[in-house]
């Protein structure tokens, strides 16, 4: 009888333990469900006023976002109400969630020294910042045009800081890789072709009988490198640009060259402060600007725009197995109404967000530059893994899905 009682007690204890475990799992499940239910939506509203912590529209145009130590830093052009000239410099904002932004002030200020390359009234566009793990420095590159010279200078500028919010110290500006041929032209066949042609043929400023641009013959000569050779001694032109840090830590400067006709992808030095001389021409003669790059599942993707000034146009898209190519062009990645004008925007950056990617673009307002808006959209992928974009009036960062009104 005593043994029987012990057995009963043991069974009751075992059953108690099991029930406790089940209850624990049930409570944990309820906690997870409650957590999900309480998760606040992080809503992105494209094309509208985006207020910062002071209730003022974010002023960071043509910019990019850096994630560092769990904080996002958004850098962009500070634009004034009446001019697109650089009267202030590059602004910086910080955020923990990509929705609510704190104004951190001016990261790179223009100079009051009239002899400085970045003197007040220059053109300073498309600033991007990357962090160098080896040096512990934050490096900013940007497109620079010297004051009073329009878009003639076509320079790249570089600045550096010890902290993400700055202040950034301007180092220098100039054209890129002077005296060095791009990799695709540095071979005997390409050099022989270049020896047969001369930019003077198309130079209206020096040749009264100059031949017209945009003919099939002109396009063939551009493809062959006639403008790259013209700019060889002084360095390649560098206008609209972005930066990209690859999986191995190498960084690349990607910019519009050759009168905006051709993109260059140039490797940066280990400290990210200069170029190594290794670079390629991409889509020669294609007239691309506003490059934005990301990497997914072994493929490099780039979205660009055409060249129509402040007016929007159809986006272009390219992919490659290596950052140095070869690059293959795709159709316009945008779908739906206003796809032919990229929903009114122009690409500036693609931001990785977990396993997802955010397409960042600007909606320019040239008559009121500071009122330019931001077009942020989730990048989607079709059944073949090809990226595409659809406009959403509102969408949630938690789900990457549209939010109903």
Region locations from a protein language model:
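Bacterial Sec-dependent N-terminal signal peptides
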Residues: 1-40
């Amino acid at each position: 009888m005593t043994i029987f009682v012990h057995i009963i007690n043991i069974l009751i204890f075992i059953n108690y333990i099991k029930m406790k475990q089940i209850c624990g799992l049930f409570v944990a499940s309820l906690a997870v469900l409650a957590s999900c239910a309480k998760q606040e939506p992080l809503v992105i509203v494209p094309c509208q006023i985006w207020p910062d912590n002071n209730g003022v529209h974010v002023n960071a145009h043509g910019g990019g976002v850096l994630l560092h130590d769990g904080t996002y830093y958004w850098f962009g052009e500070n634009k004034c109400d009446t001019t697109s000239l650089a009267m202030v410099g590059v602004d910086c904002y910080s955020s923990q969630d990509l929705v609510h932004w704190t104004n951190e002030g001016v990261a790179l200020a223009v100079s009051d020294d009239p002899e400085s390359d970045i003197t007040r009234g220059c053109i300073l566009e498309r600033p991007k910042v990357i962090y160098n793990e080896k040096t512990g420095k934050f490096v900013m590159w940007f497109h620079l045009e010297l004051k009073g010279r329009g878009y003639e200078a076509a320079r790249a500028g570089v600045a550096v800081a010890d902290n993400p919010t700055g202040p950034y110290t301007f180092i220098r500006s100039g054209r890129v890789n002077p005296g060095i041929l791009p990799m695709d032209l540095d071979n005997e066949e390409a050099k022989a072709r270049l020896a047969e042609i001369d930019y003077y043929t198309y130079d209206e400023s020096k040749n009264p009988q100059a031949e017209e641009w945009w003919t099939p013959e002109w396009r063939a000569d551009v493809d062959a490198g006639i403008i790259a050779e013209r700019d060889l001694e002084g360095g390649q032109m560098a206008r609209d640009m972005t930066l990209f840090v690859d999986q191995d830590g190498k960084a690349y400067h990607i910019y519009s060259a050759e009168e905006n006709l051709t993109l260059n992808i140039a490797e940066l030095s280990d400290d990210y402060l200069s170029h190594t001389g290794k670079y390629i021409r991409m889509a020669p003669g294609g007239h691309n600007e506003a490059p934005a790059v990301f990497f997914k599942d072994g493929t490099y993707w780039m979205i660009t725009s055409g060249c129509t000034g402040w007016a929007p146009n159809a986006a272009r898209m390219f992919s490659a197995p290596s950052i140095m190519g070869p690059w293959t062009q795709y159709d316009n990645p945008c779908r739906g109404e206003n796809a032919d004008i990229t929903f009114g925007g122009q690409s500036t950056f693609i931001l990785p967000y977990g396993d997802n990617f955010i397409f960042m673009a600007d909606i320019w307002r040239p008559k009121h530059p500071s009122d330019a808006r931001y077009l942020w959209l989730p990048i989607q992928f079709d059944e073949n893994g090809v990226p595409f974009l659809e406009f959403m009036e509102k969408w949630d960062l938690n789900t990457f899905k549209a939010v109903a009104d």
